[in-house]
Amino acid sequence: MQIQKVASDQMPPPSGEPSPELAHILRAHADAYMQNHPVGSQQGKIFRDIRHCRTPSLGVHLETCGIGCGYERVSFHSCRNRHCPKCQSLQKARWLLERSQKLLPTTYFHVVVTLPHELNPLILRNRERLYNLLFEAASKGLSELATGWKRLGAQPGFTAILHTWSQELRFHVHLHMVVTAGGLSLEGDRWIPAKNDFLVPVRALAKMVRGKFLDGLQWLFEQGQLTFSGNIAGWRNPVVFKRLARKLRRMKWVVYAEPPFSGPRHVFSYLGHYTHRVAISNQRLVAFDGQTVTFRARNNEQPGSYRRVDLPALEFIRRFLLHVLPKGFIRIRHFGLMASRNVQTKLEQARRLLQASPPTTQTRPTKDHRITWQQLLLKLTGIDPT
């Protein structure tokens, strides 16, 4: 892999060449990849869907002018696969339209919980179980710390979004959580705001997440519900597994919280940035010469700048497949006040309390929930579906 730093994210393809897309890469190399690597039915379907998305092979529909001017426009059908970078804008717009009606008029924190890379070999063989375990450990840890901690002592509401990739498409499992800066009192009679831009102590949260995750991992091991194969086949030995667990308990797990957003409008925009993102968007692809894929990645050493990453096409496809979600897996989940069982009760009570009280409310809910999804799609993405 070669990495070249550049000063900005504006890295167009060479003059005269079309912008590369994931579909172009898969059309050129997916068959060769499948000949040399085991590919399941779900991965094969992803290859087919993305390669044929918005092409004549999926069919077309004809749009005509309703007042008889004779104008016609042919549009190719989309594949609607959740892993297709072309098919996320509409899903995102619809989701944001629905969520905008449930946001509370308060500030929000962004909390990120990351799993140690030492777990990657085990996660790759047990994706669904361990992704679920991460959601459980993070949500319970945050909820218990918020409700029991003396400086808050309230139930917050939060949305958690699973991402599995780094900027270079490596396997990097982490949760993004958008959390209300405060919560409903345990008695349900008042809103308790977070004090001094401080939600909960992140070190304590990291320890709680670590403990809950490793306790759950131990239970899965004892129940024989973990798969061990290939170069981790030896991990099924209780002595070896215990050694791994002990090592993980001694490690500092990465959890951080960013300063709060200024209100629902900002968190609405932020959620749109993270929710329906796939591992690689077409906008990040810079060049494809038939053999090498070049894409841009953030340069953490120089904030605001980007670097070029060059990968052989087959390695690029391998990394892309690392981030295929289990079939039917729910990667966006809601907890606390945002949980479905609380939406009609505790969430509405919190909304009434916030709208009745002064300065803790930064802004009223936006008017975005009153526009159509077509208007919202245009606002968020610049795509006009009409």
Task: State the predicted function of each range.
Residues M1-T386:
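Beta->alpha loop/short-helix hinge microenvironment recognizer with preference
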